[in-house]
């Protein structure tokens, strides 16, 4: 299995993020509201054409986890001009990070409250301020140092903390296509037994912020190999299945994408290329 896994140190994590943003392409997360559409004309690639936002195509059912299953999945190339700055812990700790400080923060970053950027900042701060639901652990990392320390504190009482990411592998980098494609499980997905997992998603904000969350139980982690329909792109990396969705918001988009009754069944998903997945025994 070719997905990236190694014991984590700060220099290794810094190198990893550089590879995600510079060497490899990653999922573009513009500083916009989650409600703003991307407006790309790719509806002809959808299963049924009912979703306009291609980033919704990361969810799947646990019954799909088998050799030969074909799924539409979307990856998008990152525009380096839109990657926000990465702050050190010392720099990040000087800036308040809470919705209660929103007015100060908007003024500090010269962002209008009613702009898409202002709405996106508010949504990020709200998500980071929300209390974890029962059985969940969560935090927001505003620097690499804080994310690494909090990940160790949350799921690894010892040094046995590893990181996984999604990688796109092609024989020629010029042939990478970051669009909605059909991918097929090229190998039997491998379940990683007995591990704790913490998924970290980059959030829209004026500097790099990762929202990290996981569940104390009821989560299955898999390593997967996905081959594009044209046989050119091999995607390797982690996939997670949340076995108990009974506490989820009934309006969660995953239920709509998968066409299942809210809170009635497990929900699985792949990870965008700029996400980080921490795992620990």
Swiss-Prot record:
Tell me the ranges covered by the BURP domain, including all copies.
Answer: 59-281
List GO terms (cellular component aspect).
protein storage vacuole
Annotated localization: Protein storage vacuole
Task: State which residue ranges cross the membrane.
Answer: none
- Main subcellular localisation: other
Q: In which tissues is it expressed?
A: Expressed in the radicle of germinating seeds 2 days post-imbibition (DPI) and in roots of 30-DPI young plants. Expressed in the embryo and seed coat tissues of developing seeds. The protein accumulates only in seeds and only long after transcript accumulation becomes evident.
SMART domains reported in the protein's UniProt record: BURP
Q: Name one Pfam family in it.
A: BURP
Which stretch is the leader sequence? 1-25
What keywords would UniProt list here?
Answer: Signal, Vacuole
- What does its UniProt record remark on the domains? The BURP domain located at the C-terminus has not been identified in non-plant proteins.
UniProt name for this protein: BURP domain-containing protein BNM2C
Which organism is the protein's source?
Brassica napus (Rape)
């Amino acid at each position: 299995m070719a997905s990236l896994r190694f014991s984590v140190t700060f220099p290794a994590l810094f190198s990893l993020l550089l590879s995600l943003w510079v060497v490899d392409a990653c999922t573009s997360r513009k500083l916009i509201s989650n409600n703003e559409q991307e407006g790309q004309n790719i509806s002809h690639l959808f299963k049924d054409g009912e979703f306009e936002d291609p980033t919704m195509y990361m969810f799947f059912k646990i019954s799909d986890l088998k050799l030969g299953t074909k799924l539409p999945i979307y990856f998008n190339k990152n525009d380096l001009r839109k990657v926000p700055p990465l702050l050190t812990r010392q720099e990040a700790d000087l800036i308040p990070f809470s919705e209660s400080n929103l007015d100060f923060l908007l003024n500090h970053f010269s962002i209008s409250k009613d702009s898409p950027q202002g709405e996106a900042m508010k949504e990020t701060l709200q998500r980071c301020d929300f209390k974890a639901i029962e059985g969940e652990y969560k935090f927001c990392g505003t620097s690499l140092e804080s994310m690494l320390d909090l990940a160790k504190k949350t799921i690894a009482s010892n040094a046995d903390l590893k990181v996984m990411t999604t990688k796109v592998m092609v024989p020629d980098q010029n042939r990478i296509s970051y669009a909605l494609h059909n991918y097929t499980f090229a190998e039997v997905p491998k379940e990683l037994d007995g591990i704790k997992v913490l998924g970290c998603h980059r959030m829209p904000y004026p500097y790099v912020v990762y929202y990290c969350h996981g569940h104390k139980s009821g989560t299955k982690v898999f390593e997967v190999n996905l081959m594009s329909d044209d046989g050119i792109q091999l995607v390797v990396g982690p996939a997670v299945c949340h076995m108990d969705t009974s506490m989820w918001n009934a309006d969660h988009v995953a239920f709509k994408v998968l066409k299942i009754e809210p809170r009635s069944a497990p929900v699985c998903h792949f990870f965008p290329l700029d996400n980080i997945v921490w795992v620990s025994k």
